């Protein structure tokens, strides 16, 4: 199968000019087919504040009410996405910015209310792998914003890690897929205060033990759960690494 690299980058990376430019340089240098999925939470929070819209968070997750949905749609699908696309075009990468609503790329359902009502947040149900594969084979690089739709005319805010994972899983039957989660650390750390304490690889058994011991906690837990789900669904390799190291062999590799 032909190789495909799916890169997910967090908002902190794409919202700072210096780190964004470095990321785009490195991403442009990746050989073969590729997809970029991005966040943008800090920019959304900033615009919401400028518009006097309160940003509400529960356990690090945004509550997306009607006004907040307007903000994230503008920021994720507009400002952040188009800045990335323009930057890639300047580097000779023929990129196309997409939300889940465009060509029905990603359809989701509104998350049911349990302990917390997260509002207009979507859980992915379907990825249009045929359309994405057609784009990719034509030499177009999809740049995917963390927005989906429900098929009934409503946009939904959706976790970017989830979009990257579901996209990688959907395309794993058509390509040899490597999924890379990029953030501000060198990888999964044994000690969050020591940037050099990178765990080089993690198996499911080791993951359970690290969680039990409190080594892995917080937002890293769902990131790793997404990683194992992707591997079980046919993705060849999952890497968690520093954004500036996407072309190297550093970081943490997730193993089955």
Where are these regions (language model features)?
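C-terminal catalytic "cap/lid" subdomain
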Residues: 1-256
